[in-house]
Every structure is written in C-alpha cells, then in structure tokens.
Amino acid sequence: MGDLTKSRSRQCPETLGGESKVLLFNRVDDPFTVSATTNEATALNAAVTAVYSYDLSGDGNTLEESMVGDIVTGTRVNSQTAVLTLKKMTVADSAEFNLLASSCAHAVVLTRNGDYIALGITEGCNWTIVSSTGAAKADFNGYTVTGVAQENKLAPYLDSATVTALLAVVV
C-alpha cells in the first residue's frame, strides 16, 4: 500500500493544453530507464535506433491518463490515451499508418509546455487509425491516430539527457 509523502500548493495559471509533436518508435523491451522514486525517464535504451517525428498543430491533440486503484484486488491500472490529429491524407502516410496499426510502437508526446512524456513503456501502444476526407470544403481532411496503453504507473517524463538522446535518433 502506498502512503502519501507530499502536499501540493496552488499552481499559477501558466500552462497550455495540448501536444505539439509525437515521436514514435518500434517496440523494444525497457525503452527507458525510469527512476522508481521520481518516475522520470533518465536514460534511453541503446536498442532504440530510429525514432519517427510527427508535428501536430491545432487543438484536438490530447493525452489523457486514468489511473484506477482497486483495494479489493490490490491492483492499479493506468490507461494512457493519446489522440492525435494529422492534417491531409497522403499515399505515403496511408502506407505508414497501416504499419503503425499492426505494431506495438511506443510513443513520446511533446506537450505545449515543453515536457516529453513516454507512453506504453512496458508493452507499447495499441493504435487505431481513422482517415477522414470530410464532407464540406472546410471539414477536417486527414488522420485521427489514437494510441492506447495500460501501465501500472503514470507515464514518466523524460529528463533533458534522455530527450537529447531520443532526438539524436530521429530519422
């Protein structure tokens, strides 16, 4: 059983919602070294050799985590859900998203506050791809990509050295 250790003071309204980028990479065992005390990713596994970067814009890119502890079973499950909107449908993207949907790729989202947050670090994410042409001329044309993972802790934030290592292998 976990005992609380800290209070939290009132926070100033200085943050922004949403994500500005998602980094995807093929599943590997233990992609990050994560501190047990701070839940911060402090190192990148050397097996991560290629990371694919997708820029996000506009509202509608979200990351939500919902952790549920069950006192009866003694378990806790954190559902991580990233919903990403990528404008404009293309042949190349269609082929790549077919691969993504059949993968267990890991994801790191970059928030509008400059934080990098890792998703699906134990088993990767399950991916759903929805392509939409829209109906009216001003409707969204592109992909809604949803990644879902279940972990036993909240998603770890990456420290600066780990961010540097991750960005060094973006192709």
Give the positions of each predicted feature.
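A general structural signal for short secondary-structure junctions and capping/turn motifs
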Residues: 74, 98-100, 109, 135-139
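Solvent-exposed edge beta-strands and adjacent loop segments
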Residues: 6-81, 124-137
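Mixed-charge, glycine-accented linear interaction segment located at domain edges/termini
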Residues: 123-171
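N-terminal export/ancillary region detector
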Residues: 1-2
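Short, acidic/charged, Gly/Pro-enriched secondary-structure junctions
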Residues: 95-119
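Oligomerization/assembly interface segments of phage tail-like spikes and tubes
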Residues: 71-92, 139-153
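Short, conserved charged micro-motifs
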Residues: 91-100, 156-158
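Short, hydrophobic/proline-enriched secondary-structure or compact coil segments at domain edges
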Residues: 20-27, 82-84, 103-112
